[in-house]
């Protein structure tokens, strides 16, 4: 039996903002019915697990207005610079947020953060061969941001204690724990990113 083609019959833009857009699609379901699906379009993002020679990783403590509190997270950033390859975005964010540069980059894990309503996808990189390069002047929430170094095993325990709740950080921490314990291997830097978002970046480029 052939798979059903979920055809989009029509699409309406409800909102276009600085970092996301909201659209309403009419989609044909199996059996012929038409249903409404609302989709948040997103730039997509990258995050970095930067591991030093002793198996420690830096995490940032950043205020998130959505929750009204600070969360422990990985260095990360949006893919909001047109034409910038994702791994170079990751390298820039690593330098800007924690003042580090890495000589080796690999793909650790990709995650679709909210597939029920958003096309946001995040690629988490493993960065090694670290050296300090200094952090540039920060602005907005990042000016308040602090950093801490954690052994990978301790970071994994903090996930399971509920002290790290950011989903991207959880995925990255548990993935690097799997790598360092021999359970899995990271992937090459040029690994295809199947779900990398493109709709919102294209929409912004047209403005």
From Swiss-Prot:
Mg(2+) 3 binds at residues 93, 97, 142. One of its GO terms (biological process) is ribose phosphate metabolic process. The keyword DNA damage applies. Keywords: DNA damage, DNA repair, DNA replication, Hydrolase, Magnesium, Manganese, Metal-binding. Substrate binds at residues 37-38, 64, 78, 114-116, 120. Its cofactor is Mg(2+); Mn(2+). InterPro entries: NUDIX_hydrolase-like_dom_sf (IPR015797), NUDIX_hydrolase_dom (IPR000086). Its EC number is 3.6.1.13, 3.6.1.58. Residues 41-172 form the Nudix hydrolase domain. Changing residue 93 to Q: 2.1-fold decrease in KM for ADPR. 1940-fold decrease in kcat with ADPR as substrate. A motif (Nudix box) lies at residues 77-99. Mg(2+) 2 binds at residue 93. Changing residue 64 to A: 3-fold decrease in KM for ADPR. 910-fold decrease in kcat with ADPR as substrate. GO terms for molecular function: 8-oxo-dGDP phosphatase activity; 8-oxo-GDP phosphatase activity; ADP-ribose diphosphatase activity; metal ion binding. It comes from the Bacteria. Optimum pH is 8.0. GO terms for cellular component: cytosol. Mg(2+) 1 binds at residues 76, 97. Belongs to the Nudix hydrolase family. Homodimer. This is ADP-ribose pyrophosphatase.
């Amino acid at each position: 039996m052939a798979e059903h083609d979920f055809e989009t019959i029509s699409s309406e833009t409800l909102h276009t903002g600085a970092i996301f857009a909201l659209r309403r699609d009419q989609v044909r379901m199996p059996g012929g019915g038409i249903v409404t699906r609302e989709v948040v379009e997103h730039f997509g993002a990258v995050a970095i697990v930067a591991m030093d020679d002793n198996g420690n990783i830096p995490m940032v403590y950043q205020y998130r207005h959505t929750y009204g509190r600070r969360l422990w997270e990985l260095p990360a950033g949006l893919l909001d610079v047109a034409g910038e390859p994702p791994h170079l975005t990751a390298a820039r964010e690593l330098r800007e947020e924690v003042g580090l540069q890495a000589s080796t980059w690999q793909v650790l894990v990709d995650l679709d953060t909210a597939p029920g309503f958003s096309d946001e996808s995040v690629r988490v990189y493993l960065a090694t061969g670290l050296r300090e390069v200094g952090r540039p002047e920060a602005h907005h929430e990042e000016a308040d941001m602090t950093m801490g170094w954690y052994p990978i095993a301790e970071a994994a325990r903090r996930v399971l204690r509920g002290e790290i709740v950011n989903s991207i950080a959880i995925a990255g921490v548990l993935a690097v724990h799997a790598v360092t314990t021999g359970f899995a291997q990271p992937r090459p830097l040029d690994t295809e990113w199947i779900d990398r978002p493109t709709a919102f970046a294209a929409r912004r480029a047209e403005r």
